[in-house]
Amino acid sequence: MTQNQLDKKSEAWSALFSEPMSDLVKRYTASVFFDKRLWQADIEGSLAHAGMLAAQGIIGKQDHAEIERGMAQIRAEIESGAFEWKLDLEDVHLNIEARLTQLVGDAGKRLHTGRSRNDQVATDVRLWLRGEIDLIAELLVALQLSLVDIAEKNVEVILPGFTHLQVAQPVSFGHHMLAYVEMFSRDAERLQDVRKRVNRLPLGAAALAGTSYPLDRELVARTLKMDGVCQNSLDAVSDRDFAIEFTAAASLCMVHVSRMSEELILWMSQNFGFIQIADRFTTGSSIMPQKKNPDVPELARGKTGRVVGHLMALITLMKGQPLAYNKDNQEDKEPLFDTVDTLKDTLRIFAEMIGGITVKPEAMEAAALRGYATATDLADYLVKKGLPFRDAHETVAHAVKAATSHKVDLAELPLAVLQQFNPNIEKDVYDVLSLRGSLNARNILGGTAPAQVKAQIARHRARLA
């Protein structure tokens, strides 16, 4: 077929219509310039489909061989940048099919037997997303290991733990970092669970009702290493819940990144001064020469909003659609693609950035002392002396008030002053009131005692190995 003939037949449905499509409509409906990233999945799915057609005797062995030859050339052309993507051909699927037909003639025309673009695109997106989930899983491991590394280096460093952004109790800095490891480990689990539902084969559903050809859908699923086939043809081509579910899991992961970003931004500020982010991950000011700005965590915090917005876009896209396929579903790709790109870029840069953080233990400890972080330890001390907790709570509140008025820490109050609040207080109270003593006392599974933190680090290293 000549190029002129191809151009005239660029629309797969052109014989039915009495006038050509408006150029404005072509531009409005075309998706090739963003869905062309699906080309590998499209070729992979088409080859599996062609192999099945040949195995079932629906196309001949020679046609199958020609399709494989043509697809190999198309793959080489795309990889080299020589492939010409055409707006008139609307999307990645028709672009590849048209080029295949140009290369191998009638064999290329037979490829679409028993297949619709409806089940084709659903298959392509699933294949592509499966691969992206696997890449994201690797990036999540790298980020978790980076957090485990910084935790291991700072097990003994004391950080003020906060509630309501007020100093609450002392914690190990390593323990704090491991909290994010736990969050990201759940994100990884969620994504692996999503993968199970992504990895199902729509091919064979055709436009919406299945096909009269004797297709072997299970063979195609095995060829593509999918976990099974979609069991209802209407559902297979019309729903994008797998994309919504992935974007929901990605949104949660980005929310965890955003929470960590907020803390890094605060900790780097002069008012906290707990950490320094490496220069290569910061920027300066065009007017204020003293500035070193945490742009990376700030942008991650902002990009989280965009990813959550994509989730809302996809949910809204699906909510009003009747069965089966509607053109609305073309709008699933840009939010999905951008979610994947944003999440991968963010995880990649954070894994590197965390490794370049300088921790400032003196500033952290000073902040913990200023905030009376061992007040709860004093209350626990009094409970162990027989005082009901609520009475102990009130007693310690009076002691904190006295320390505040004298502008000293609880541990700096003389024993005689402490005994004014409760005569059962003895000299051993000063062991309890030290930051180190408070930390070591939390020696319970999941607690912040260094021994527990070290055990958790070992557990995470074994899990991530």
UniProtKB/Swiss-Prot annotation:
What's its EC? Answer: 4.3.2.1
What's its catalytic activity? 2-(N(omega)-L-arginino)succinate = fumarate + L-arginine
Keywords, sorted A to Z: Amino-acid biosynthesis, Arginine biosynthesis, Cytoplasm, Lyase
**PROSITE patterns the UniProt entry points to:** FUMARATE_LYASES
Biological process terms in GO annotation: arginine biosynthetic process via ornithine; L-arginine biosynthetic process
Into which EC class is this enzyme placed? lyase
Pathway noted in the entry? Amino-acid biosynthesis; L-arginine biosynthesis; L-arginine from L-ornithine and carbamoyl phosphate: step 3/3
Q: Name one GO molecular function term.
A: argininosuccinate lyase activity
Domain of life according to the entry:
Bacteria
The subcellular localization recorded is: Cytoplasm
Record-linked HAMAP family: Arg_succ_lyase
The UniProt entry's sequence similarity note says: Belongs to the lyase 1 family. Argininosuccinate lyase subfamily.
Record-given protein name: Argininosuccinate lyase
Origin organism is: Variovorax paradoxus (strain S110)
Instruction: Give the organism's phylogenetic lineage.
Output: Bacteria, Pseudomonadati, Pseudomonadota, Betaproteobacteria, Burkholderiales
